[in-house]
Amino acid sequence: DHAGGLRVLLKSLNCPVYISGATRDAYIREKPSLTNGESQKRADAIRNRTVEIDSGKDFRIGEIDFHPFSVPHDAADNFGFVAEYCGVKVATLMDFGCITTLIKEKLTGCDGIVIESNHSRDMLRACAVYSWDLKQRILSRSGHLSN
């Protein structure tokens, strides 16, 4: 999710991009709002720099083991991660709409947990700027966790 700035970021960083195939495809796919060949620019920016990851397959970066898992969100192939180093486990979950049985299982035994929750249900409902459709999407089980 939120990979829109990746192309610009990669201009100043020389690093691999760990990304699922579905997320990569969604990132490259041109949206009607993207013009001037942005889709091709995105494809060029990540060419030969991606390491494909999967929610069911652990991977390692340096000495840190990563245990990815699927989370419910309305974007292409969203993951949470448990990172483990020397027996210490820290979980990160950014965009997800609800806590599932799988999430509970993955968080069990973690030494630290970082969770993004970015709205108050009452404030969101009262917000005059957001459309009702957007509010419903945010509040859904595949939207965003409330505070």
Predicted regions and their residues:
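Core dinuclear metal-dependent hydrolase active-site scaffold
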Residues: 4, 52-109
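Cap/insert and terminal regions of metallo-dependent hydrolase folds
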Residues: 101-147
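Glycine/Thr-rich phosphate-binding loops of Rossmann-like dinucleotide-binding domains
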Residues: 3, 27, 123
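Short hydrophobic/aromatic-enriched beta-strand-loop microsegments
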Residues: 16-21, 49-53
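Short active-site oxyanion
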Residues: 12-17, 90
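Di-metal (Zn2+ and/or Mg2+/Mn2+) metal-binding site signature of metallo-dependent hydrolases
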Residues: 1-13, 21-23
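Short, structured coil segments at secondary-structure junctions
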Residues: 12-13, 46, 109
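Active-site neighborhood of divalent metal-dependent phosphoester bond hydrolases
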Residues: 23-50, 83
